[in-house]
Amino acid sequence: MTTNAAPTKRSILLINGPNLNLLGTREPEKYGSETLSDIEENARRQCNELGFDFEGFQSNHEGVIVDRIHAARTDGTTAIIINAGAYTHTSVAIRDALTGVRVPFIEVHISNIHAREPFRHHSYLSDVAQGVIVGLGTLGYTAAIWSVVEKLKQGGFS
């Protein structure tokens, strides 16, 4: 029996939180010289080469990030990669949104949050994330995309 069903679309959503819109000019000694646009363009290219759609999203507002995570539940998002910025250390709301939508996610940080100020050492996301990548600079985004694709090839996240 032949079906005409469309293939399932695979899509990666990259969420960046507060102040990450300033990448390239904000503390380049910690975050490097790449802009958010550079990161998103590299991620889009990598996703497309691997057969995935890509959406980049950035907001400085916690509720807007929560709303975008909620939308991922029904918009075809296969996986989320999130750098929640400072909200990593403060936002139970973002944690609850991520666990509530049941879309697998990987937490990424450009700098090593464990080698910085003590208040940055705790993440509200790490213990519910499928993976955490810190301290690799913007290469962490590339590693996260590769990890998502490889996990899905192996049958998905458990």
Swiss-Prot record:
<dbReference type="InterPro" id="IPR001874">
    <property type="entry name" value="DHquinase_II"/>
</dbReference>
<comment type="subunit">
    <text>Homododecamer. Adopts a ring-like structure, composed of an arrangement of two hexameric rings stacked on top of one another.</text>
</comment>
<feature type="binding site">
    <location>
        <position position="83"/>
    </location>
    <ligand>
        <name>substrate</name>
    </ligand>
</feature>
<comment type="function">
    <text>Is involved in the catabolism of quinate. Allows the utilization of quinate as carbon source via the beta-ketoadipate pathway.</text>
</comment>
<dbReference type="GO" id="GO:0019631">
    <property type="term" value="P:quinate catabolic process"/>
</dbReference>
<dbReference type="InterPro" id="IPR036441">
    <property type="entry name" value="DHquinase_II_sf"/>
</dbReference>
<dbReference type="GO" id="GO:0046279">
    <property type="term" value="P:3,4-dihydroxybenzoate biosynthetic process"/>
</dbReference>
<dbReference type="InterPro" id="IPR018509">
    <property type="entry name" value="DHquinase_II_CS"/>
</dbReference>
<keyword id="KW-0672">Quinate metabolism</keyword>
<feature type="binding site">
    <location>
        <begin position="110"/>
        <end position="111"/>
    </location>
    <ligand>
        <name>substrate</name>
    </ligand>
</feature>
<dbReference type="Pfam" id="PF01220">
    <property type="entry name" value="DHquinase_II"/>
</dbReference>
<feature type="active site" description="Proton donor">
    <location>
        <position position="109"/>
    </location>
</feature>
<dbReference type="GO" id="GO:0003855">
    <property type="term" value="F:3-dehydroquinate dehydratase activity"/>
</dbReference>
<feature type="binding site">
    <location>
        <position position="120"/>
    </location>
    <ligand>
        <name>substrate</name>
    </ligand>
</feature>
<comment type="similarity">
    <text>Belongs to the type-II 3-dehydroquinase family.</text>
</comment>
<keyword id="KW-0456">Lyase</keyword>
<feature type="binding site">
    <location>
        <position position="96"/>
    </location>
    <ligand>
        <name>substrate</name>
    </ligand>
</feature>
<feature type="binding site">
    <location>
        <position position="89"/>
    </location>
    <ligand>
        <name>substrate</name>
    </ligand>
</feature>
<feature type="site" description="Transition state stabilizer">
    <location>
        <position position="26"/>
    </location>
</feature>
<comment type="pathway">
    <text>Aromatic compound metabolism; 3,4-dihydroxybenzoate biosynthesis; 3,4-dihydroxybenzoate from 3-dehydroquinate: step 1/2.</text>
</comment>
<feature type="active site" description="Proton acceptor">
    <location>
        <position position="31"/>
    </location>
</feature>
<protein>
    <recommendedName>
        <fullName>Catabolic 3-dehydroquinase</fullName>
        <ecNumber>4.2.1.10</ecNumber>
    </recommendedName>
</protein>
